[in-house]
Amino acid sequence: MGTSSSSSGLVKAKSETLAEALKSSSLDFSNGDGSSHGSKQHVRARTLSSPSYSSNSKNRWNTHIRKAKSAHPALDLAGLTGGAALSRASSASLGLSFSFTGFTVPHEEIIASERCSNDDILEDIEAATSSVVKFQAEPTFPIYLKFIDITYKVTTKGMTSSSEKSILNGISGSAYPGELLALMGPSGSGKTTLLNALGGRFNQQNIGGSVSYNDKPYSKHLKTRIGFVTQDDVLFPHLTVKETLTYTALLRLPKTLTEQEKEQRAASVIQELGLERCQDTMIGGSFVRGVSGGERKRVCIGNEIMTNPSLLLLDEPTSSLDSTTALKIVQMLHCIAKAGKTIVTTIHQPSSRLFHRFDKLVVLSRGSLLYFGKASEAMSYFSSIGCSPLLAMNPAEFLLDLVNGNMNDISVPSALKEKMKIIRLELYVRNVKCDVETQYLEEAYKTQIAVMEKMKLMAPVPLDEEVKLMITCPKREWGLSWWEQYCLLSLRGIKERRHDYFSWLRVTQVLSTAIILGLLWWQSDITSQRPTRSGLLFFIAVFWGFFPVFTAIFTFPQERAMLSKERESNMYRLSAYFVARTTSDLPLDLILPVLFLVVVYFMAGLRLRAESFFLSVLTVFLCIVAAQGLGLAIGASLMDLKKATTLASVTVMTFMLAGGYFVKKVPFFIAWIRFMSFNYHTYKLLVKVQYEEIMESVNGEEIESGLKEVSALVAMIIGYRLVAYFSLRRMKLHSST
């Protein structure tokens, strides 16, 4: 009893404190306060002045404002218990929060929220007060998303024949501004495929049915109005949260904004998403400790809402998150939707609190549509067709059990029971697979509400024709010039990879190799009739040809997901990224070779002339850049690390054998291999630098001017990189089959 009374007193005290805060806050938003009233008028005027809003939108906006003025009931907590008082206070706080953004919670939902437990209310208040108030009603171009009879098939090729597999079978639905649509179903039901189709990430020729945005088909111009958050968190692990969002703002926001305004926008997104505490923490990854999973997901969402998209698509935003973090993510999405955006998300198995945040629901099973409508009416619909839970359970859990055929705790119609008995007998006797539950639910949906929902989808969206045409506006210009993109991407690349270049493992590898070589060729005699230094020079050519190839191979395959994501959002020009990626590391590429040559050069007693030393450094540098080009070309062409490593091993071994040290005369029909070998040209240049004016030939190779070798290395540097660049141009950003 003591514990209960103390808990009730604590809850009531919190309720009274919250009520006082709300009372003082309501004074700030009252009509009598000129400053706050002016602020609201400023927001209203700014929104109404936006060309994105029609006269109908203005009327709706005025309606929301009128609702907002009456959305704050008097907080009379006298005579209430602790739980009831806290429930009343939380309802008022939610009403205040949504009215501040221009949207209000219906009175029925406020009353219903009082039935929640005290723990649920406390957690909802924390989520609401930490995120809802922060999202302001900023002008957003409205997008009314409709999809009717969506079908999608893939062709699977076998050894002798090919067959088509149906992934989506006539899916229909809609999502309008201010709504959160959830795509729910078991694994393999087609949720991600449908989301990709809605985001225009498939070749439109492979999709049946129609997807419309304000009654207009998809076009590339829509890329700037659609945000897409993938299931995997694609981020650079060594950048901080603040750096990640700042680079996104600088690259994606229009050039009409100054650099300071873009940085302020990034700071406001950090604040809106509640990332202030971790903004200076690295993102982290598999081998780098960083932010938590929920914070990483919020950073991904922040990258997409940075440009104020009208349509936001999210693939499993709550996967691998605990229930509390998942609730905060969905609460945040709910608030973003109420700010006038259209939100569509896939979700696997939400909790009951998450489920009640959804405005609309699509239930899929094996690519078939089992339900589309309001999420709040889903249980009523399935009860109407004879399927209802025997126990009190989470609605999402009930729906997933139903579509998966788990009928232990579910009441089903007798007709379905009879069919299930027959199917089980066939499964036992003939080993035949048939989803009788899916067939029954699909037929029930088609006969009950599918026709009515399609008729609703046929109605035109409530927008003026002028506003509809704005969705096909000319393609947005780049946020930065080519040179500015190059500089920014170079700086980002150096910050991201600075940890790899100077890792203790790489420095130890280079220094230990240099010391071993210096000891083996300790103070060798350059005037000897048998030049032993040629072996050292050849090894230097091989080492600095082998090392960069297998480092560069990983460049584009590892960054493929990031490159695809950023190119999908028109973040930068591919040419600016490629040049920045291949040139920003060049200063860093000089540090380890210089350190290597300083150790080897003086320990082995190579030619002690400043000119010879710097020419040796330049020769090794040309070899490194040429070898990197080969690695980049192989990696970009194959985009498969196993295949790329195998091909690179064979190529480097061939170049080494044809490098002029092991084989003096190569048969004429494969002599061209020698001229493609950067090892051969590097070795000849190093021999020239060390033995010029001392010997006319070394190991049977005449010492020439070196112009031919330098020209060959420069040609390789340019040629290999061109191959890599055009391979990236050909790279598919997403599956189109």
Curated annotation (Swiss-Prot):
One of its GO terms (cellular component) is membrane. Residues 26-59 are annotated as: Disordered. Keywords: ATP-binding, Membrane, Nucleotide-binding, Transmembrane, Transmembrane helix, Transport. Its main location: membrane. It is found in: Membrane. It is a multi-pass membrane protein. Residues 26-38 have a biased composition (Polar residues). SUPFAM superfamilies: P-loop containing nucleoside triphosphate hydrolases. Residues 145-391 form the ABC transporter domain. Residues 484-691 form the ABC transmembrane type-2 domain. ATP binds at G185, P186, S187, G188, S189, G190, K191, T192. InterPro entries: AAA+_ATPase (IPR003593), ABC2_TM (IPR013525), ABC_transporter-like_ATP-bd (IPR003439), ABC_transporter-like_CS (IPR017871), ABCG_dom (IPR043926), ABCG_transporters (IPR050352), P-loop_NTPase (IPR027417). One of its GO terms (molecular function) is ATP binding. One of its GO terms (biological process) is transmembrane transport. The chain crosses the membrane at residues 502-522, 536-556, 586-606, 614-634, 653-673, 706-726. Belongs to the ABC transporter superfamily. ABCG family. Eye pigment precursor importer (TC 3.A.1.204) subfamily. This is ABC transporter G family member 27. It comes from Arabidopsis thaliana.
